[in-house]
Every structure is written in structure tokens, then in C-alpha cells.
């Protein structure tokens, strides 16, 4: 095959690194203990779906009917992406953050969720550790600074956080968009914390949807 001929010409037998997948696996595993997420088919039960850094309609087309089925039952679909993709045009709302500002946006959302009393403390106490340190960091976030970093106004950050925490079941769907950049693992770690802090994992259709295999 062409790729083998290319590596033969370089004198190499294989690429001794991973281009993307391990970034997401390690980020999710840092939070969940394993790199797996919710079953994508369960998105049909979601009432909030954040498509974060994924042009689902083009690169994950077989999942789109599931998302449309959820919309038919009242789900709101939000695309979080620096690019105005085909999926963003079809979504209910497009949150167009600056490239590389994902962690800042998540921390801003966590600040709002904590500030407004939307943290599921019972879930955190029963199923997690270190959450108090996380929320202490989130409380120090300045939303005006977050708006400057992300290019998203404070009202939109508050809307996104409140919608995810209260319009349930709520899920985040990520694919390779966050992996093909510097600090992608940290972005995946941050996103994995969102459904834990709100207790989204309690419900079918809630959680983080990324990989279904290890």
C-alpha cells in the first residue's frame, strides 16, 4: 500500500507515536478511569446535545439520524466549534469560540454551574474525588476574562452552562477536533468533568460520548 511504500522510503517500519486517539483516551481516562464514554445510540434520549469540535453531519453521518430523533423529541443541539461547519448551520445554536480556548470555556461554564447552585454534590460525593479542588478553581474564574479569551460573551457562556445543567438528560459529543491540537488532552479532561459536576451520568442520554472501544 502507498503508506507502507512511503515509510519504506524513509527507512521506517511504523510511526512511533499516535496522531490523535490516545490524546482523547488519556484525557477521558484521567477523569473516568477508562477512556470509554456513553453509547452514541443513547443520544436519542438526550435533551441537550453539545457537539463539541465535531462536524457530525459530514464526518459522523451515521450518527446524525440519532441526533435528529432526539430533536424530534425536543432536544436542543448546540455546536461548539471555531468553524462555521455544515453541522453548525443545521444546529439550533452555534457557539463559535476562539481556537484553543476550550478549557477556558469549560471552566467558565463550571463557574456558572457552581455559582447558580447547579452542582450535583450528592453525585460528586458518591462517585468522584477531587471535586472540591476543581470547584475551588472554578470559583476563581472571572467571566469577563473568559469572554475575552474565548470570544464568547458572558450571556452566552451563562446560557450554555445553564442549559447543560438543567435541560436533561444532557450529553457532550466529541470527536477528533480537540485531538489535533496542542493540549488536546487537557481539553478532553475538562470536557469530561462537565457531566460529572452536573450528575449527567445519572440518566440515560447523559454523559460524555467519545469512544466506544479501547
Question: Whereabouts are the PLM-identified features?
Answer:
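Catalytic alpha/large subunits of respiratory electron-transfer oxidoreductases
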Residues: 1-214
Amino acid at each position: 500500500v502507498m503508506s507502507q511504500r512511503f515509510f519504506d522510503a524513509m527507512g521506517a517500519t511504523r510511526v512511533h507515536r499516535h496522531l490523535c486517539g490516545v490524546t482523547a483516551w488519556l484525557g477521558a481516562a484521567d477523569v473516568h478511569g477508562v477512556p470509554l464514554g456513553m453509547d452514541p445510540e443513547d443520544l436519542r434520549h438526550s435533551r441537550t446535545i453539545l457537539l463539541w469540535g465535531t462536524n457530525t453531519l459530514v464526518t459522523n453521518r451515521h450518527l446524525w439520524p440519532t441526533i435528529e430523533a432526539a430533536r424530534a423529541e425536543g432536544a436542543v443541539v448546540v455546536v461548539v466549534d471555531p468553524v462555521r461547519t455544515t453541522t453548525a448551520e443545521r444546529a439550533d445554536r452555534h457557539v463559535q469560540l476562539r481556537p484553543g480556548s476550550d478549557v477556558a470555556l469549560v471552566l467558565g461554564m463550571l463557574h456558572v454551574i457552581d455559582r447558580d447552585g447547579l452542582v450535583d454534590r450528592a453525585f460528586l460525593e458518591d462517585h468522584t474525588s477531587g471535586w472540591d479542588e476543581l470547584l475551588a478553581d472554578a470559583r476563581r474564574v472571572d467571566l469577563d476574562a473568559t469572554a475575552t479569551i474565548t470570544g464568547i460573551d458572558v450571556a452566552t457562556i451563562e446560557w450554555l452552562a445553564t442549559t447543560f445543567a438543567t435541560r436533561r438528560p444532557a450529553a457532550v459529543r466529541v470527536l477528533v477536533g480537540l485531538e489535533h491540537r496542542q493540549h488536546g488532552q487537557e481539553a478532553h479532561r475538562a470536557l469530561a468533568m462537565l457531566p460529572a459536576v452536573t450528575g449527567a451520568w445519572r440518566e440515560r442520554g447523559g454523559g460524555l460520548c467519545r469512544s466506544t472501544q479501547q
